[in-house]
Swiss-Prot record:
Annotated pathway: Cofactor biosynthesis; coenzyme M biosynthesis
EC number: 2.5.1.76
Name this polypeptide is given: Cysteate synthase
Taxonomic superkingdom: Archaea
Pfam family for this entry, one: PALP
Molecular functions (GO terms): ATP binding; cysteate synthase activity; L-serine ammonia-lyase activity; magnesium ion binding; pyridoxal phosphate binding; serine racemase activity; threonine racemase activity
Length: 417
């Protein structure tokens, strides 16, 4: 018996389980699970939420999961009585075992599992500003699946791993931003022998990120009134919204749709600009507190995309300055006792701004998604190694595609994969 189907929320038609597009509209395909009430599984890491993940098996090794706990320190500092933090990262005494220190693992593991289930043999192509690349390198190293990473040159410091054997990973840098890395990746993924991971259209990525909301609600036993997250493309917000829809249908956790509070880093905040109509000018992404949050082409207007999620939840987008993020990060780390990545500091600052603007009340139930943390802690306890750069390119190089194809073929020939 099938576990799930994939439907188009635009036309309502059932599509292939691996579909990324509907032939009739621009909607993001969405999973519909036959099991309407989720039961946590006795499985490792994120597979605890196996019921609502679009997979029919698991990757046993290497998966962590979101961990939700009631905040004391940060909540007290902000005078919030019901702030719950969902932490994604490395924090052993708090059951945090995500070894990439980023919630991007929640996307990479189910995506990889689906490739394996589909007997996919093509090289997986991933464009990333760093954290997604690290997550896919982690799971590719565990499974031995061939992976081509295309990342901006300035993001290579994020390409580290705790795995020893990274021979299935080929890393290419582009002297440009994330958008230029995406453009290059799209060209390569269109070639024979390569497959794209699908981005926001990949239901495995979205449902994987949706486990943040699942963990929060199954831990607190109720849907929150407010959900905070820093976003680049906004896909994490879509994921939280879709998970909340399923939890409302589950029937055991209330029927209130959590209000989405999404945060972007000024001055490079396309979603914020689109949503508010305010134009922001700056040197992007160089002037950002965290350039992983810069995405020039977010899925805003697609059916089932960011705008629909905001409209359905009465959501809001905040523009956060570097100074606001830095101050919020210090307050969080001092009061919670764990280091966090720059991106979730944007979300911490958004909570502080929401309080100032009266968008939330001190006694309301709030979930804060800490999308990455514990890297300093991990580096103290575990050995890490940088991924080697196999090829460095200029986006203006007319022969760039051929050079990438040759490099991948060379690594394959030499047994790199």
């Amino acid at each position: 018996m099938k576990k799930y189907i994939v439907k188009c929320p635009g036309c309502g038609e059932v599509r292939d389980q691996y579909a990324l597009h509907c032939p009739d509209d621009d909607a993001l395909p969405r999973t519909e699970y036959f099991k309407k009430q989720i039961v946590p599984a006795d499985m490792p890491g994120m597979w605890r939420y196996y019921d609502w993940l679009p997979v029919n098996g698991i990757i046993e090794k290497g998966s962590g999961r979101p961990v939700t706990y009631k905040s004391e320190g940060f909540a007290k500092e902000l005078r919030l009585s019901d702030l719950n933090i969902t932490f994604n990262g490395y924090w052993p005494e708090n059951e945090g075992f995500i070894r990439t220190c980023s919630f991007k693992d929640l996307e990479s593991f189910p995506t990889m599992q689906r490739l394996l289930e589909n007997n996919e043999r093509r090289v997986l192509v991933v464009a990333s500003a760093g954290n997604t690349a690290r997550a896919f390198a982690h799971v590719a190293s565990i499974t031995g699946y061939p992976l081509l990473l295309i990342v901006p040159k300035n993001s290579t410091h994020r390409l580290w791993t705790t795995e020893e054997d990274t021979s299935s990973v080929c890393t290419v840098t582009v002297d440009g931003d994330y958008y230029q890395a995406i453009a290059m990746a799209e060209k390569i993924a269109a070639r024979d022998g390569f497959v794209s991971e699908g981005g926001a259209r990949n239901v495995a990525r979205r449902d994987g990120m949706g486990t943040v909301m699942l963990d929060a609600v199954l831990t607190t036993k109720s849907l929150p009134q407010h959900y905070f997250q820093a976003v680049g493309s906004g896909t994490g917000g879509i994921s939280a919204w879709e998970a909340a829809m399923r939890l409302i249908e589950d029937g055991r956790f209330g029927n209130n749709m959590p209000r989405l509070h999404l945060a972007q880093n000024l001055p490079c905040a396309p979603l914020y600009s689109t949503w508010t109509g305010e134009q922001t000018n700056g040197n992007c992404p160089e002037e950002m507190y965290d350039d992983v949050l810069f995405n020039r082409k977010p899925p805003y207007l697609a059916t089932g995309g960011v705008k629909d999620a905001l409209d359905d939840t009465n959501g809001i987008i905040y523009g956060i300055t570097n100074k606001e993020a830095d101050e919020a990060r210090k307050i969080f780390e001092e009061n919670e006792g764990i280091d966090i990545l720059p991106a979730p500091a944007i979300a911490c600052a958004a909570i502080m701004k929401a309080l100032e603007k009266g968008e939330i009340k001190a006694d309301e139930n709030i979930v804060l998604n800490i999308t990455g943390g514990g890297q300093k802690r991990l580096e103290e306890e575990l050995p890490t190694r940088q991924l080697s750069v196999d090829l460095a390119l200029s986006p203006d190089d007319k022969d760039a595609e051929n050079k990438i194809l040759e490099k991948v073929a060379e690594l394959l020939k030499n047994g790199g994969y």
